[in-house]
């Protein structure tokens, strides 16, 4: 037991030794290299660990593979950064920055670390409150059904967040190379794109998640379609908020520490009140209320007003614009398809129906945003122009 624990501690400690290198690569818009190294080494480690466990090898050896994975990552990150940034070896920071600036930078870094810590703690509270309240008031059995759907939402959010992570470095680079107005246009475009992606994923989740869970874990795990609709709203928020989170990282703005705390408080209070009247629906509604108030309204307001110094008229216009397009899509898709839920008893038929059902909402979203949203229209024009030149 102590050997296994010691291996895990050493393995975790090693991961901090190459954090500086990953930060440098990310800041230089080479996050794909970070993802390549970490993704490849972890994937190989997981495959080897699974193989060793199947073979019945001692567990401490399986844990040692994790340690070996971090050692390999440390070596690869060190070699890569030395190759790409050889000037770092000879660079003496005291030659380029005076002591007063060093103290100022250290103070700012410490402050931002504290703010980030508060954000992370509040995020843990928000994302785990539902499970705690469900286990206390509704029982452990309900968690199985709830977590099956949440696993799909979180996996989708994790995948999209991983793809979107380089955008933060891009915004940071543009902040210092271009005007504030151009940075605002870029963030506005990201808002439109992630709102599009969010509402598309939420719609597909609504019509397909219950059948997926039924095929995966059995019909007894399936939740009511009314509850699935509520979870779809949370799915939309989880994806749409990525644009704001990416912008915050790019702008280095973590000062809104009161917002995640407010989100957690609203979520807990509303969920505790509504669980007595609406059961599981009430808990999900509590999360929706906190998401809409804090994540979808207050967070962009704080971002535009404090980080970008935008005026109130622009902020109101940006919020109304985003929700207006979503409303048009929802009304149109309901009128066209009636949001018919996919029903299937076979995996192949299910995936075929998912592919077929995704065509209409995807085309409808592209049409709505290309007609009404100038940012998306210009973006699509540039993409088509690049494709035409390549051909």
Named regions from a protein language model:
Residues 109-113, 147, 179-208, 225-228, ...:
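Interfacial transmembrane-helix starts/ends
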Residues 59-64, 104-112, 134-154, 182-185, ...:
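Interfacial/gating helices of multi-pass transporter permease domains
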Residues 7-26, 34-49, 62-78, 119, ...:
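Short runs within selected transmembrane alpha-helices of multi-pass transporters and secretion channels
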Residues 27, 85, 90, 153-191, ...:
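Helix-loop junctions and terminal segments of transmembrane helices
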Residues 1-7, 205-236, 281, 308, ...:
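Interfacial segments at transmembrane-helix termini and the short loops linking adjacent helices
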Residues 63-66, 75-128, 170, 178-185, ...:
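Interhelical loop/hinge segments that connect adjacent transmembrane helices in multipass membrane
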Residues 90-91, 306-311, 334-391:
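Membrane-proximal transmembrane or re-entrant/amphipathic helices at the cytosolic face
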Residues 51-56, 117-120, 124-155, 173-174, ...:
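Helix-terminus/linker motif at the lipid-water interface of multi-pass membrane proteins
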